[in-house]
């Protein structure tokens, strides 16, 4: 049996065991980086050298360590499936080792409050301007922001209990984790912007998406408007997810308790918030240096 035929059955096996949003990402990555490479191979004829050649091919793509690790786990899972389902004899599997770790420098970017105010002036369109205000001032994940409906707004509080897959068919689904279900507070100014946007719709239903009305916004269109605004404001572009980083960094730099930030972001553990966001807290670093310089050490 060739690799591609076996992969179709494997994908059905995986699909029945995971959420739609997770599977759509898995399907994309597995198809792009594994099936496309092995599609002409027969699963019975795979050798350790074939797998090593694939690892070299992937290594040459200069992906991150974490992404390489994901791809390795995907391929290993497929091989184990073939071993059980089709009795393929892969005695070499114990020698199929993970990718070697490379030294990585974190590529993290975000907008400061001053930069965001400059960025937001680049919008003429009320819908997309309000969307990015929401992203920056709530820290919601992009899929969560796109999924917000009018019924989710109650005064200064917004209920986050669903998400939209950014890479698939834009279907509504449950949030990333149980902790992602949350209620977050919004400022009066953001509430006013949201109300103005909702009032602009010709006919309004509580089941309308706040951003888009009958249908949610498309990620490609959001990015197109973002790039236009960046060009107009003469500021570098950051990813949609980095607006979430921007919000977290804004809170950290204003000395908001890490537990409150973690809950607001929908993290299941405070350690996740610390690992992901504290490296960008430059103001805290400045305070640390100032404190150290002010300390008089008694050496004797």
Regions found by a protein language model. Give the residues of each.
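N-terminal core-binding DNA-recognition domain of tyrosine site-specific recombinases/integrases
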Residues: 3-4, 8-80, 216-221, 236-239
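Basic, Lys/Arg- and aromatic-enriched nucleic-acid-binding interface segment
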Residues: 69, 88-91, 95-142, 146, ...
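Catalytic-site neighborhood detector that most strongly recognizes the C-terminal catalytic loop/helix
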Residues: 110, 164, 265-290
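C-terminal secondary-structure termini that scaffold catalytic or DNA-interacting sites
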Residues: 170, 174-181, 188-190, 291-300
């Amino acid at each position: 049996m060739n690799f591609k035929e076996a992969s179709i059955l494997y994908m059905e096996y995986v699909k029945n065991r995971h959420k739609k949003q997770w599977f759509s990402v898995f399907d994309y990555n597995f198809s792009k980086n594994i099936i496309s490479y092995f599609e002409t191979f027969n699963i019975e004829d795979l050798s350790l050298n074939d797998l090593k050649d694939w690892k070299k091919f992937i290594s040459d793509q200069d992906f991150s360590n974490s992404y390489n690790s994901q791809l390795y786990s995907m391929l290993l899972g497929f091989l184990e499936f073939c071993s059980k389902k089709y009795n393929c004899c892969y005695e070499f599997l114990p020698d199929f080792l993970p990718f070697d770790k490379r030294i990585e420098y974190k590529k993290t970017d975000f907008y400061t409050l001053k930069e965001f105010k400059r960025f937001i002036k680049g919008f003429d369109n009320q819908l997309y301007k309000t969307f990015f205000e929401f992203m920056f001032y709530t820290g919601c994940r992009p899929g969560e922001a796109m999924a917000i409906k009018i019924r989710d707004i109650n005064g200064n509080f917004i209920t986050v209990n669903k998400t939209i897959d950014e890479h698939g068919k834009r279907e509504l689904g449950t949030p990333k984790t149980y902790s992602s279900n949350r209620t977050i507070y919004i400022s009066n100014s953001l509430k006013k912007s949201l109300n103005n946007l909702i009032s602009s719709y010709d006919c309004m239903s509580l089941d309308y998406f706040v951003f888009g009305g009958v249908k949610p916004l498309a990620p490609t269109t959001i990015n197109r408007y973002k790039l236009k605004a960046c060009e107009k404001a003469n500021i570098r572009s950051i990813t949609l997810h980095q607006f979430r980083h921007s919000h977290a960094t804004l809170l950290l730099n204003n000395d908001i308790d890490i537990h409150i930030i973690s809950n607001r972001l929908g993290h299941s553990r405070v350690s996740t918030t610390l690992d992901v966001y504290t490296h960008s807290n430059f103001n805290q670093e400045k305070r640390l240096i100032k404190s150290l310089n002010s300390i008089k050490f008694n050496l004797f």
